[in-house]
């Protein structure tokens, strides 16, 4: 999806211009009350052009009325363009995704093993298909046989192919991706219209986006201000009549448009849509605008150690026996406990055992494999002769104690030594006898210390949850720079951590990818699920990361904060604009009748007519000038919340007061020659 990342694309601009005219339809524009008021004013001006004296005698020429009409039309078109352009970027992404699933066929595996070519839309969940090198995977599914590299760039934008194989963490495939080597047999998991790609298209094509609570609140405020200014203008007419000041209806219409918050009113929808779009640029799909907005309020982040803070695939680096006599037995037992373990850790133990053991290791072991679970925290194999297990120190010590076994005196010191280095110790037992420890090495991701420091400045606390013991957790937490950690944390413990933080009034975000993460993802205010994760995790979350990079949560939270700050900054600018325009225009209109108003005419505008035209032109131009900021967002990197607030008040608050005075004066210096 990265190929639609440019902010300005000729095709999108043309489409946005077309949509700008379509959105002139009052049925469309009434969704934005502020711009609807502008359109009503434009229609009234058009009536005045056709019937100049319909509301009473006016000294304004038809050409002047036409000028007002054109400027009002352009103002609405600029506002429509900002929204249409933001929507167009999402639709362009949807089109690129739709290309990935067009005209696909599938090689269906019949019950007798024969193949039959069918249309991808005919596939049913539970059917098996075969996809070979150079073919596109026709549906979402799970690899049941084979190993191949798959190009997922059509979905994720990542050019490097990924390896897919049965079992383990990399057996899920997405329809629309391309097999670039070998072959795969896949069990179909979704049917036409319900695939992950279909859901992605529906998400990024959300033109009918529901407004978020903050947007609704702000829109209510802006609508209220619009009504107040309308009341001010309506009362201004009889006051002007009492003072024998002639204020034509067209001028009152223009004054209304200048004073109501048209700037933020024209950009508000674009800011929200662009916020979702910026999340999509990071290959994260937001199920709603509310999800992105809530990210901006997050002040506690729950982070898994494995895959988020460390690279995830812990590698067996050393076997540490309780004594030298146990050396060979430890290697063989570690190998046997891992031979059917499809996890990256299990495979690394098998590789290390083969490298270090001189004699031949058994290839086929007839026994019952016991996989690792979050409850037991151990895995191994039971045969007729022996039982071999590896697992977390506490679990293994408790198991040996329950079976009246002996605990070697040095086993805890070996585990503590591994933990103090930031590694993960796994104790190996054979027939209830402890043989030693496997040292799994964890590597912390680059640049996290700086990123966590940046989050701290923004008022966000980071909490690392890990199944490791307290010593290992403390070492990694200190090295990575997280604020707090929760050691020996099970999936159900994550929910407790989240609820405890929420009870304190915090807004909590977390990442997850497994079925056991689904309850916590649903409980958290923001849940970011991995694309490589289970369906239940993706359904529970409100954000999905296509790159399956848990660290992405940090970027998403920043974008959420940027969205809120952009909306706040442009609202501040718009309201400051209104105040400035009020004091810029009103004295110019009233000073001929009320000489004291001359003192307030600090801009020395040439005439009431040029003042109105200049203000209208400025009002229209400022909308288009702010579109890039609405699309890209204000800068928030590296600053504390207080610093960002001060910067925004200086730039957008003070700037919103000064810019209209300068802009209107410059335009007036040109307009006075034509009015």
From Swiss-Prot:
Main location: membrane
Chain ranges passing through the membrane: 34-54, 65-85, 216-236, 245-265, 569-591, 611-631, 644-664
Cleaved signal peptide residues: none
Topology relative to the membrane: Multi-pass membrane protein
The enzyme's E.C. designation: 7.2.2.6
Residues annotated to bind ATP: 341, 345, 372-379, 390
Keyword Membrane among UniProt keywords: yes
Keywords, in A-Z order: ATP-binding, Cell membrane, Ion transport, Magnesium, Membrane, Metal-binding, Nucleotide-binding, Phosphoprotein, Potassium, Potassium transport, Translocase, Transmembrane, Transmembrane helix, Transport
Record's subcellular location: Cell membrane
SUPFAM superfamilies from the UniProt entry: Calcium ATPase, transduction domain A, Calcium ATPase, transmembrane domain M, HAD-like
Molecular function as annotated in GO: ATP binding; ATP hydrolysis activity; magnesium ion binding; P-type potassium transmembrane transporter activity
Catalytic activity field: K(+)(out) + ATP + H2O = K(+)(in) + ADP + phosphate + H(+)
Active site: 304
PROSITE patterns linked: ATPASE_E1_E2
Residues that coordinate or bind Mg(2+): 513, 517
Record's GO cellular component terms: plasma membrane
InterPro entries listed in its UniProt record: ATPase_P-typ_cyto_dom_N, ATPase_P-typ_P_site, ATPase_P-typ_TM_dom_sf, ATPase_P-typ_transduc_dom_A_sf, HAD-like_sf, HAD_sf, P-type_ATPase_bsu_IA, P_typ_ATPase
Known partners and oligomeric status: The system is composed of three essential subunits: KdpA, KdpB and KdpC.
Functional summary from the UniProt entry: Part of the high-affinity ATP-driven potassium transport (or Kdp) system, which catalyzes the hydrolysis of ATP coupled with the electrogenic transport of potassium into the cytoplasm. This subunit is responsible for energy coupling to the transport system and for the release of the potassium ions to the cytoplasm.
Family: Belongs to the cation transport ATPase (P-type) (TC 3.A.3) family. Type IA subfamily.
PANTHER family: POTASSIUM-TRANSPORTING ATPASE ATP-BINDING SUBUNIT
Protein name: Potassium-transporting ATPase ATP-binding subunit
Lineage, highest ranks first: Bacteria, Bacillati, Bacillota, Bacilli, Bacillales
